[in-house]
Amino acid sequence: MSVYRRRLSPLKPNQVIDYQDVELLRTFITDQGKILPRRVTGLTAKQQRAVTKAIKQARVLALLPFVNRES
């Protein structure tokens, strides 16, 4: 029987997720600009919803690209 280790969340429990913190948000998107799923990021459901909302708001305000185009 294999033993699974519980992943630690990359965010602190009370850390505020802000749409203006682009460097933090970039850790949760792929090179193509897609939002990483919860099973990859290791976030809680509540944190994942907050990150998703922040990324989408940052995209609308042109702080993050919708699609990362390689030229």
Swiss-Prot record:
Residue runs in coiled coils: none
Gene Ontology biological-process entries: translation
Superkingdom of the organism of origin: Eukaryota
Keyword Ribonucleoprotein: yes
InterPro entries linked: Ribosomal_bS18, Ribosomal_bS18_CS, Ribosomal_bS18_sf
GO cellular component annotations of the record: cyanelle; cytosolic small ribosomal subunit
Molecular function per GO: small ribosomal subunit rRNA binding; structural constituent of ribosome
Subunit structure: Part of the 30S ribosomal subunit.
Protein name according to UniProt: Small ribosomal subunit protein bS18c
The encoding gene: rps18
